[in-house]
Curated annotation (Swiss-Prot):
It holds the Pfam family Pescadillo_N. Residues 323-416 form the BRCT domain. GO terms for molecular function: ribonucleoprotein complex binding; RNA binding. Belongs to the pescadillo family. Component of the PeBoW complex, which is required for maturation of 28S and 5.8S ribosomal RNAs and formation of the 60S ribosome. GO terms for biological process: exocrine pancreas development; maturation of 5.8S rRNA from tricistronic rRNA transcript (SSU-rRNA, 5.8S rRNA, LSU-rRNA); maturation of LSU-rRNA from tricistronic rRNA transcript (SSU-rRNA, 5.8S rRNA, LSU-rRNA); oligodendrocyte differentiation; regulation of cell cycle. It comes from Danio rerio (Zebrafish). Component of the PeBoW complex, composed of bop1, pes1 and wdr12. The complex is held together by bop1, which interacts with pes1 via its N-terminal domain and with wdr12 via a high-affinity interaction between the seven-bladed beta-propeller domains of the 2 proteins. The PeBoW complex associates with the 66S pre-ribosome. This is Pescadillo. Residues 455-489 have a biased composition (Acidic residues).
Length: 583
């Protein structure tokens, strides 16, 4: 007794998905508005497992969304605002066509708008969730803040992104949360630790750039609209945690120090305060004046399940972080006009240093180049005409490398005109079996407090090789004489044997050798491991072989890189010798 036969494509996966066109018609939105709505709400297309079933037997390429997501969008208030805006544009176009200017003004005053506050609260229920997703928001805001004021995007969006990015940088400076910096071809990567969350973002270089034509700026603008709202919420909450005034204001002392004689020459009166904030050279005002108190040393007790060693490691890391936060304390920097001012000022201020620049370069300079208390003058040119004796003249890379190394590196390798050492990425963490370049080994030795003698040893080896080459000719004659004597002795021994004269045989009493327990233990472990491998199941043996193959491949690659580096070093040494001989 069979029941009613089910019709095709009326149950299962065929009813769980909906095409983009059907979804758009269901919401009564244009394609552009539908795309905006999906970006704002975080709805994305899905790829069904059985396309043919979903598409009712057809194999045509289509975009599918989950039906429950589209039903969820039906109750979104922004959908109504999109429809209101569509009606507003239609009415405005009619008013322009009829030249009814009073109606145009009235319509512009009543232009429909919407807020994304409820969407932010919906997508990020807790503040930590928002912090975890703030990386892309920061990268997009920093990108838009560098755009020129062209027709590609609204001026208000550029100004908003600039304001939010300056607020973020000022917070990082006040909390001293920056941990790593890396200069790449794409831009400058920063990594900060905010409330226990690691946040990484990229900032483009301050170069004039042409807008590419193959980029959809409307999609980017929609993402920016969401990200600016998110970043505004995050900045407000972070400023509250540090008891800072929001929107940020300079404290009284900082405002006095940045008081320029001719501020109108730098910026308009309405923009001068924003420019002073973006200078990053003064501290921010607080709601309640902070009272400096001696930090009491608290007793640390291991938590449940945490042993003493882990607690000691954690304490050591905390000490390193507190030491890194004060890396540039007591140092005064002066930036020459050719160096990246904003990036260097941001990094130096994050670690407690003071920074200034020429008055004609930008608003916000706090002291002149003639100040005798300046300790480091950052220059990016081969030489300088006028130099002061009581300061170091270094290249900008010293600041970034010192931050990544968590110590003040020796300045000798960063003087003017000196070939800089390689800028190593702080985001690479070497594991067992990986290739570690000599520069990284030298840096690790400096971090341990050792003085690496790598360069001196190389120079000594070079000198020894030259001495050996000179002495080889002198030693050849003595070696020939020794070989001749050995051949004569062997000939005499052969003659004695042939004449029947046996050599004297001596028997020495044997001695009991002490057993090497460490070696015996290692052999026992190796035997146990071999037996364990033999007892493995087929599946486990396959996985084990794959793991060992991966480890061996990693070792081979590391050896290959080490051989390449050795060949490169040998070639550079040979070139140096040739140059010396020519001289």
């Amino acid at each position: 007794m069979g029941g009613l036969q089910k019709k095709k494509y009326e149950s299962g996966s065929a009813t769980n998905y909906i095409t983009r066109n059907k979804a758009r018609k269901k919401l009564s939105l244009s394609l552009a508005d539908f795309r905006r709505l999906c970006i704002l709400k975080g709805i994305y297309p899905h790829e069904p497992k059985h396309k043919k079933k979903v598409n009712k037997g057809s194999t045509a390429a289509r975009t599918y969304y989950l039906l429950k997501d589209i039903r969820f969008l039906l109750h979104e208030p922004i959908v109504g605002k999109f429809r209101e805006y569509k009606i507003f544009v239609r009415k405005l176009r009619k008013a322009y066509g009829k030249a009814e200017w009073s109606a145009v003004e009235r319509l512009k005053e009543n232009k429909p708008g919407y807020k994304l506050d409820h969407i932010i609260k919906e997508r990020y229920p807790t503040f930590i969730d928002a912090l975890r997703d703030v990386d892309d928001a920061l990268s997009m805001c920093f990108l838009f803040s560098t755009f020129a004021r062209t027709g590609k995007c609204h001026v208000q969006t550029i100004q908003l992104c600039r304001r939010l990015s300056v607020e973020w940088m000022n917070y990082i400076i006040s909390s001293r949360s920056l941990r790593k910096v890396f200069l790449s071809i794409k831009g400058i990567y920063y990594q900060a630790e905010v409330l226990g969350q690691t946040i990484t973002w990229i900032v483009p270089y301050q170069f004039a750039h042409n807008h590419p034509t193959d980029v959809d700026y409307r999609v980017m603008a929609t993402f920016t609209e969401l990200y600016t709202t998110l970043l505004g919420f995050v900045n407000f909450r972070l400023y509250q945690t540090l008891n800072l005034v929001y929107p940020p204001k300079l404290d009284g002392q900082g405002e006095i120090s940045l008081k320029a004689e001719f501020e109108e020459d730098y910026a308009l009166e309405s923009e001068s305060y924003t420019e002073k904030l973006s200078a990053l050279s003064a501290s921010l005002a607080r709601m309640v004046a902070s009272v400096e108190e001696e930090e009491a040393e608290l007793d640390h007790f291991p938590t449940e399940g945490e042993d003493q060693e882990k607690m000691e490691v954690r304490e050591k890391m905390e000490q390193q972080q507190s030491k890194q936060k004060k890396l540039f304390e007591g140092l005064k920097f002066f930036l020459n006009r050719e160096v990246p001012r904003e990036s260097l000022a941001f990094v130096i201020r994050c670690f407690g240093g003071e920074v200034s620049w020429d008055k004609s370069l930008c608003i916000g300079s706090t002291y002149e180049a003639t100040d005798e208390t300046i300790t480091h003058h950052i220059v990016d040119r081969p030489s300088m005409d006028k130099q002061y004796i009581n300061r170091y003249y270094i290249q900008p890379q010293w600041v970034y490398d010192s931050v990544n190394a968590k110590i003040q590196l020796p300045v000798e390798e960063y003087f003017l005109g000196v070939t800089l050492p390689p800028h190593l990425s702080p985001f690479v963490e070497e594991t067992e079996g990986d290739y570690v370049p000599p520069e990284k080994l030298k840096l690790m030795a400096l971090q341990r407090g050792e003085k690496p003698q790598a360069e001196e040893d190389e120079e000594e080896e070079g000198e020894e090789e030259e001495d050996d080459e000179e002495d080889e000719e002198d030693d050849e004659q003595s070696e020939d004489e020794e070989e001749a004597e050995e051949e004569a002795n062997l000939a005499e021994m052969e003659e004695k044997r042939s004449q029947g004269k046996s050599l004297s045989v001596k028997v020495t009493p044997g001695k009991a050798k002490a057993e090497n327990r460490a070696r015996a233990a290692e052999e026992e472990k190796a035997e146990e491991k071999r037996l364990a491998i033999m007892m493995m199941k087929k599946k486990e043996k396959y996985l084990y072989d794959k793991i060992m193959f991966g480890k061996k491949r990693k070792v081979r690659e590391a050896n290959k890189l080490a051989a390449k580096r050795k060949a490169h070093d040998d070639a550079s040494k040979a070139d140096k010798k040739k140059k010396k001989k020519k001289c």
